[in-house]
């Protein structure tokens, strides 16, 4: 049961790239019902998976990645999502940010996933200086935020970016940080 939860979170994070959580949460129940295990998903074609995720952004690429990821989970990891971040990044569709999200959320690893909100907010409020890439941002944040707070600080920065420090019309007058 725990492995299913971990696999479901990994799939949801893969699907969330350039997509809203709301859309992902609307899409995943049917996907997980159709493919309740990595073994079941590994037997599916990308076209079959596409039918369940077509309302998600970039569904063709994500369907191919999910099928290949499930096959690799089964062949190389015994159907178990690896906890090692480097091993996670070997899976199709899993880059540094996705691996860091899974590491922080599932295993409480002291890492800082950097999405567009984290990148923007950390620069605006001065947690980073001159960072031009997500990796530079991640490394600066890991120096500037106590390590035990990194897994939750990621969520704080995302929420602040979604609701206060928005990209187009930041609510600086409502910001308790600025």
Residue spans of the language-model regions?
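Catalytic cores of DNA base-excision repair glycosylases
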Residues: 1-3, 7-178
């Amino acid at each position: 049961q725990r492995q299913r939860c971990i696999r479901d979170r990994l799939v949801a994070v893969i699907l969330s790239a350039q997509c809203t959580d709301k859309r992902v949460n609307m899409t995943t129940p049917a996907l997980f019902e159709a493919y309740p295990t990595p073994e079941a998903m590994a037997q599916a074609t990308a076209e079959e998976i596409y039918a369940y995720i077509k309302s998600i952004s970039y569904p063709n690429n994500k369907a191919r990645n999910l099928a290949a990821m499930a096959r690799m989970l089964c062949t190389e990891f015994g159907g178990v999502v690896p906890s090692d971040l480097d091993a996670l990044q070997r899976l199709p569709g899993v880059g540094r940010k996705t691996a860091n999200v899974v590491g922080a959320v599932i295993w409480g690893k002291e890492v800082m996933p950097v999405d567009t909100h984290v990148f923007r907010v950390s620069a605006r409020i001065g947690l980073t200086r001159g960072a031009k890439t997500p990796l530079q941002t991640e490394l600066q944040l890991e120096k500037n935020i106590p390590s035990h707070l990194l897994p939750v600080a990621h969520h704080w920065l995302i929420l602040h970016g979604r609701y206060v420090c928005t990209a187009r019309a930041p609510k600086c007058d409502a910001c308790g940080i600025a």
